[in-house]
Amino acid sequence: ISTMHKSKGLEWDRVYLMSVNNYDFPSGREYDRYISESWFLRDHLNLEAEALAQLEILQSTGDYDWYDEGRASQSARMDYVSERLRLLYVGITRAKRDLIITWNGGRDGGMRPAESLSALIGYWEEQMNEFGGEG
């Protein structure tokens, strides 16, 4: 057993990727949720990113620098989405023969399969239809 982080450069005959949903692997869509954001905060702001952005503006000497609430949260989301997509790629490419990917609906049932997983499933189904064979 290994994490995706520690598996880079390694391969196994069978790989299991768990919880590939829009919380653990968000795509940047409006309905995605993020670990760094709390549901009870207005506009689901990432407080750490917003605080750092405010500190940068305070230290800035430019006349045209200003704090735009929410921009830092959006930037942090996109950074997180990129990092998680790279990590998912690492996980997928560790499989030599078998790749098993699962997702869950979360505690409240509001989670969906990750958009990247849905795209992969669509691609796989196209290939099966085009070339035949079992999935």
Task: Enumerate the predicted regions with their spans.
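Conserved helicase C-terminal RecA-like lobe
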Residues: 2-94, 98-105
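Long, charged, helix-prone linker segments
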Residues: 107-135
